Amino acid sequence: MFKDFFNRTKKKKYLTVQDSKNKDVPAGIMTKCPKCKKIMYTKELAENLNVCFNCDHHIALTAYKRIEAISDEGSFTEFDKGMTSANPLDFPSYLEKIEKDQQKTGLKEAVVTGTAQLDGMKFGVAVMDSRFRMGSMGSVIGEKICRIIDYCTENRLPFILFSASGGARMQEGIISLMQMGKTSVSLKRHSDAGLLYISYLTHPTTGGVSASFASVGDINLSEPKALIGFAGRRVIEQTINEKLPDDFQTAEFLLEHGQLDKVVHRNDMRQTLSEILKIHQEVTK
């Protein structure tokens, strides 16, 4: 009797709960902040221009959402929408990666260009989208940017460029690097014509883009906490054998050291650009 009592196994008393993860929540209805991890309604976040309600982190905007935020409704006309990259160096798997990003983003390349109006003032615009090849600069990006700059020069329009890039596109080699000089020459012609160029640096702006067209605006603006620099932090520290400040390569650090004119919160982006365009319009009358 006692032997049977001690050998008796206890019945487990628990309930099995079925995993219902995401079953009742439509895809895309919620977004998690990449910084503080707070989960928010995607629609409400979009209404706040993708700025986190909890930590104020500026989550990336798509190129078209950025243009929508700074332009009058229905005023944007896109240029060169169908232009796509070739594979000049026959780099393995390059075209496959391009096609994958095209399907993922709905873009042909990592920059959208065209003209728009802000409070009735016409301007040329280029917006880089870091979802596509991390916004890396290849031949198509250089060509599209040069074309819109040249259009602005010919039609005497101010030009606004939003940069977001990991640098030059390695799969295009020297062809990618030459876009640094090519875009700078177009901007020089625009400047010589007495026209305004506003460079708006967003997170991240690095490498060849930061060393060329992103840094030569008549007015250089940035979003808060944006990473802006040329080489990586670790590379610099190993080269100079020194420890860099914690806020090195942030927008605030560059503002403090005179490399930016202003750090602008995204909710103030439209108003700030409108005020600058109005000043330029008055001066050039």
UniProtKB/Swiss-Prot annotation:
Keywords: ATP-binding, Cytoplasm, Fatty acid biosynthesis, Fatty acid metabolism, Lipid biosynthesis, Lipid metabolism, Metal-binding, Nucleotide-binding, Transferase, Zinc, Zinc-finger. Pathway: Lipid metabolism; malonyl-CoA biosynthesis; malonyl-CoA from acetyl-CoA: step 1/1. One of its GO terms (cellular component) is acetyl-CoA carboxylase complex. Its cofactor is Zn(2+). Its EC number is 2.1.3.15. One of its GO terms (molecular function) is acetyl-CoA carboxylase activity. It is found in: Cytoplasm. The keyword Zinc applies. Signal peptide: none annotated. A zinc finger (C4-type) spans 33-55. InterPro entries: AcCoA_carboxyl_beta (IPR034733), Acetyl_CoA_COase_Trfase_b_su (IPR000438), ClpP/crotonase-like_dom_sf (IPR029045), COA_CT_N (IPR011762), Znf-ACC (IPR041010). Belongs to the AccD/PCCB family. PANTHER family: ACETYL-COENZYME A CARBOXYLASE CARBOXYL TRANSFERASE SUBUNIT BETA, CHLOROPLASTIC. This is Acetyl-coenzyme A carboxylase carboxyl transferase subunit beta.
